[in-house]
Curated annotation (Swiss-Prot):
Species of origin: Bos taurus
Entry-linked PROSITE patterns: GLUTATHIONE_PEROXID_1, GLUTATHIONE_PEROXID_2, GLUTATHIONE_PEROXID_3
Protein name: Phospholipid hydroperoxide glutathione peroxidase
Catalytic residues as annotated in Swiss-Prot or TrEMBL: 73
Broadest EC class assigned to this enzyme: oxidoreductase
């Protein structure tokens, strides 16, 4: 058996940590191609709104709301307003909010990262904003691919994100515990927070 054939056969096991060191496995599993191996959100990384790579392991021990945002959607005002409110009231209790701009729905997030950051500043956003990404399709960010297939992250009528402001509640261990549709306002999540904070 050639080395390249052997490598192809063993690559999934190596990448998922069956043969690799635990620290190395958690870094490798969250790559663009091997997101299925991840066991928690903490195994991923993403660029923040300023283009700096952020290891999502920094959210270990925190309850997180992860959402796709857009600045020109009919649901923008209510979502930004309520997310800012939730963050203000629960950040000291350990809540973190991760907002990922996305232009896939009605092209309602057309601006640059700098323009998105300026827009969010108008709402006095203090939660974490990330660089613009795709949430559906082959180019979707690996975190979003992973969240959509988790047992409690699956959607109605298929797992694809249907519109702006789909929200995922993530527990302190980095596991998806609930998915909220785009028509559900952020304050709906508040009733579920005491179980996880």
């Amino acid at each position: 058996m050639s080395f390249s054939r052997l490598y192809r056969l063993l690559k999934p096991a190596l990448l998922c940590g069956a043969l690799a060191a635990p620290g190395l496995a958690s870094t490798m599993c969250a790559s663009r191609d091997d997101w299925r191996c991840a066991r928690s959100m903490h195994e991923f990384s993403a660029k923040d709104i300023d283009g700096r790579m952020v290891n999502l392991d920094k959210y270990r021990g925190h309850v997180c709301i992860v959402t796709n945002v857009a600045s020109q959607u009919g649901k923008t005002d209510v979502n930004y307003t309520q997310l800012v409110d939730l963050h203000a009231r629960y950040a000291e209790c350990g809540l973190r909010i991760l907002a990922f701009p996305c232009n896939q729905f009605g092209r309602q997030e057309p601006g640059s990262n700098a323009e998105i950051k300026e827009f969010a500043a108008g709402y006095n956003v203090k939660f974490d904003l990330f660089s613009k990404i795709c949430v559906n399709g082959d180019d979707a960010h690996p975190l979003w691919k992973w969240m959509k297939v988790q047992p409690k992250g699956r959607g109605m009528l298929g797992n694809a994100i249907k519109w702006n402001f789909t929200k995922f509640l993530i527990d302190k261990n980095g596991c998806v515990v609930k998915r909220y549709g785009p028509m559900e306002e952020p304050l709906v999540i508040e009733k579920d927070l005491p179980c996880y904070l």
